[in-house]
């Protein structure tokens, strides 16, 4: 169940997002509200999360979700 549905804060800390945009998209779809990444992933992570959020919004607007 996405965390947004139950209105709780959900965070992930670790290296799982480093170089793995597929996992970032999975977390966004599940409603994660916070991530912490190591310094090597700081530049790429916001872009991965933003792209996943855009895809989710487009799917919702198209009625694909």
UniProtKB/Swiss-Prot annotation:
What the entry lists under Gene3D superfamilies is as follows: Phosphoenolpyruvate-binding domains (3.20.20.60)
The domain of life for this entry's organism is Bacteria
> What terms describe the molecular function in GO for this protein?
catalytic activity
Xref: InterPro entries: Pyrv/PenolPyrv_kinase-like_dom, Pyrv_kinase-like_dom_sf
Please give the name of this protein: Uncharacterized protein Rv2003A
